[in-house]
Amino acid sequence: MSTEPNCPFSGNARKHTAAGAPSNADWWPNQLKLNILHQHSAMSDPMGEAFNYAQEFKSLDLEAVKKDLLALMTNSQDWWPADFGHYGPLFIRMAWHSAGTYRVSDGRGGAGSGNQRFAPLNSWPDNVNLDKARRLLWPVKQKYGRKLSWADLMILAGNVALESMGFKTFGFAGGREDIWEPEEDVYWGSENTWLDDKRYSGDRDLENPLGAVQMGLIYVNPEGPNGNPDPIAAARDIRETFARMAMNDEETVALIAGGHTFGKTHGAGDVKHVGPEPEAAGIEEQGLGWNSGFGTGKGGDTISSGLEVTWSTTPTKWGNNYFDNLFGYEWELTTSPAGAQQWKPKGDAGAGTVPDAHDPSKRHAPAMLTTDLSLRLDPAYEKISRRFHENPDQLADAFARAWFKLTHRDMGPLSRYLGPLVPKEQLLWQDPIPAVDHKLVDEQDIAALKTRILASGLSISQLVTTAWASAATFRGSDKRGGANGARIRLAPQKNWEVNQPAELAKVLQKLETIQKDFNSAQSGGKKVSLADLIVLGGCAAVEAAAKKAGQDVKVPFSPGRMDASQEQTDVDSFAVLEPAADGFRNYARKGLEGSAAELLVDKAQLMTLTAPEMTVLIGGLRALNANVGQSKHGVFTKQPETLTNDFFVNLLDMSTKWQKSATSEGVLEGRDRATGELKWTGTIVDLVFGSNSQLRALAEVYACSDSQKSFVRDFVAAWNKVMNLDRFDLA
């Protein structure tokens, strides 16, 4: 038998990792997906660590960009001709589909990162031919380079498209930074077939956190639920999916009517003529997909959704003709040339009133989607639609505001908005916080306040738990939540089970007394906000706990938070931030105990934590006795409220044998191997740091005999990160 290596250029060349060997996830599909904690690092980012997009964007001549985009709108290209001689409707669809993936439940999706450039979104069935829209934008992106992200450009192009067709938009903010690899943390559904809908159970109950009815769609099936052309049933789907994007009925009607004022859908022929999506297309396609063999494959022969609908007689001009047509005709079911279910005026009504997108010698009748008929046949939608029809100015205002909300919902607070086009009006969904209007506390004040807090009778665990509860609502997905605003004292957060309302009220009462006493004793307008005081209390407690462990540390603290009012807090909007589980506080709602480890990783990802940061925080918070309800699960120490590495030392102690509790779901018992004596109890969240090989490797670092100092150092750094997650003013 020959031992000579195969020639690397022969057909028997060895395969390498990039050729697609089975991954660990293929072998063990149920293992924790810790990779979601290490996305978008400097290793995948070509811009360099010194790159500051906000500064680059501020130097951008936005009016020049808009001028270039305006010229592009009517500069039709032979390789992808513009419908009606205008690319505006295509760019509106691109921007809408970039933003429309947002779901309020976990804040993921949305337009904030330019993720439409990558799989799976770039290849979703609902995004057919949006690859062409981005290629049309490439000369603009190429011209302005690092000053203008793809994420901002896609939304700006949608705005300019609307303005170029006579619509006045509400405004535009830049500040969206591009990612450079696909997102691994977003759960788009369990289906492995496009347009499948295993996400439903019971009486059409849509799985959380999903915001679309089928795999690969943005919202709903335009033909109706599973292709059933029932406008009333479709209205139910519309209402559910738009609500999951934080839109009410009026905003929903405005968005559908406003968007469908422009452009058309494409179903010139059978979809069997359409080639594979971009991620499956051949290398010669250079990232484009859906190459069609029907006729020319473009222009009048374009196939996208399979539906062939033009709603308005003026598809490149803002107006009220969408509602004129919706209410002006009686509608009957028909099929597109591709066989898709759609609606036409009964008889020959409306014939010749709608222009052809590419042949000026042809005219057509208007058409509607099943989901358009929902706006006429659903009683609540109809009432709004008729009001908009009779009051076009109300439609224009509602659409402008809803479009702005759609395209900016995941950008976070107003302080992150960049550029001269940011509207002055502050909106409730932006979670407003008052601007700093007083002199901030200095180092001497901070030291005095710490002393007062620690002498107040509040325990280390009370102070730590309250600060954590205030800060840990932050979501990096849509930049909501966090300690700024002190909304933990307001509804709904003050009533959340995880925040232990009765205990929280006691802590807040004492902190408010300290705040009042301090502020009343000051001159020159100096004040401390309760938001700052809550965080400072946690920092003081961490320092005290470290001192008990024999280490003097100074936990960083940056004043400047302000206190929001109840009027500035939308209770329903903030309700979605309530955690079903918070493994850092060893909390999970009943029934979720078995998936607590996965929920911990999900929360850590939303808080932008790495696996090492998550690990050290768990160990520290257990030592600080910060569990909900003062539960002893995972408090593997004989000296609670002392910042030691005991959690890791005792978790990895081989003299302890672990077994599942016979009486408590999700709880394990650690017993002495020799005597059987019960030593500790822990949850799945605690024990996963010993069972998962990657987390055990991290736990071992902090369990070593020389790791106490590094443990405290790393805990303080991670704690400081969490306390400042929403301090965009410090960046």
UniProtKB/Swiss-Prot annotation:
GO molecular function: catalase activity; heme binding; metal ion binding
EC number: 1.11.1.21
Alphabetical keyword list: Heme, Hydrogen peroxide, Iron, Metal-binding, Oxidoreductase, Peroxidase
Residues at the active site: H97 (proton acceptor)
Chain positions of cross-link Tryptophyl-tyrosyl-methioninium (Trp-Tyr) (with M-245): W96-Y219
Superkingdom of the organism of origin: Bacteria
SUPFAM superfamilies, per the entry: Heme-dependent peroxidases (SSF48113)
Signal peptide interval: none
CDD domains: catalase_peroxidase_1, catalase_peroxidase_2
Region (Disordered): 1-24, 339-365
PROSITE patterns recorded: PEROXIDASE_1, PEROXIDASE_2, PEROXIDASE_4
Transition state stabilizer, annotated site positions: R93
Cross-link Tryptophyl-tyrosyl-methioninium (Tyr-Met) (with W-96), sequence positions: Y219-M245
Co-factor(s): heme b
Job description of the protein: Bifunctional enzyme with both catalase and broad-spectrum peroxidase activity.
UniProt name for this protein: Catalase-peroxidase
Organism: Polaromonas sp. (strain JS666 / ATCC BAA-500)
